[in-house]
């Protein structure tokens, strides 16, 4: 016997699917939308209660969508299947935010870079370095994580950075990394890495356009600061 509360067990006028069909998805709350995805609750909580408590317990959708599968499955009522559903939804959301017509994303300002990577990087618990490879029209053609861990100039080697750009026929690059503290203020090492990569780029003929440091919903551009 299945003891899990399903959406169909709710009164018809309270079922989020019925409300979505009748009134449109935009009228549903975050909890209702999540309930539509997860579908079933537990023997002690119906799906609406579970969805609401899940969002509250993790600190909101931003935090929910940055949980690992291990963190999600520690939450009461969330098994591997529901954790996988949440992670898939999170990834789709991130990809949609970075999608533009024709899959082309043109960089005109540091804000464009922030909009592209912020959702993926702002709540990371470790430092991660991304490289964005651009063509001659400043359209992003490739994005890759090249390093995870504490960044310093002895570890981040220009060869690893520019090798990707050369393989992908890049005209220029932008690097991005996050500060897990949430404060994007550049460290001395951040500045040293930036200057080193800028000089190497000049020699190779692939310009480092910017180094963006991501914090919690804020960023710093080395170009805007005048570092490069």
Curated annotation (Swiss-Prot):
It comes from Clostridium botulinum (strain Okra / Type B1). One of its GO terms (biological process) is proteolysis. A motif (JAMM motif) lies at residues 177-190. NCBIfam families: PRK00024.1, radc. PROSITE patterns: MPN, UPF0758. This is UPF0758 protein CLD_1541. GO terms for molecular function: metal ion binding; metallopeptidase activity. Residues 106-228 form the MPN domain. Pfam families: RadC, UPF0758_N. Zn(2+) binds at residues 177, 179, 190. Keywords: Hydrolase, Metal-binding, Metalloprotease, Protease, Zinc. Belongs to the UPF0758 family.
């Amino acid at each position: 016997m299945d003891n899990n509360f399903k959406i169909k067990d709710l009164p018809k006028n309270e079922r989020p699917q019925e409300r979505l069909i009748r009134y449109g998805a935009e009228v549903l709350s975050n909890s209702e939308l999540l309930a539509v995805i997860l579908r079933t609750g537990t023997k002690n909580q119906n799906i609406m209660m579970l969805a609401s408590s899940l969002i509250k317990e993790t600190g909101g959708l931003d935090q929910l969508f940055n949980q690992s599968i291990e963190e999600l499955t520690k939450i009461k009522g969330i098994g591997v299947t529901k954790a996988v559903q949440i992670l898939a939804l999170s990834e789709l959301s991130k990809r949609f935010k970075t999608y533009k017509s024709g899959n082309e994303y043109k960089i005109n300002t540091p804000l464009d870079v922030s909009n592209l990577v912020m959702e993926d990087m702002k709540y990371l618990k470790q430092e991660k370095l991304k490289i964005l490879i651009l063509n001659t029209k400043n359209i992003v053609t490739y994005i890759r994580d090249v390093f995870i861990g504490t960044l310093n100039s002895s570890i981040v080697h220009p060869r690893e950075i520019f090798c990707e750009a050369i393989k992908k026929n890049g005209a220029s690059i932008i690097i991005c990394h996050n500060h897990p503290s949430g404060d994007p203020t550049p460290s001395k090492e951040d500045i040293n890495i930036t200057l080193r990569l800028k000089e190497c780029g000049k020699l190779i003929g692939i310009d480092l356009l910017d180094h963006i440091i991501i914090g919690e919903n804020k960023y710093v551009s080395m170009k805007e600061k005048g570092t490069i």
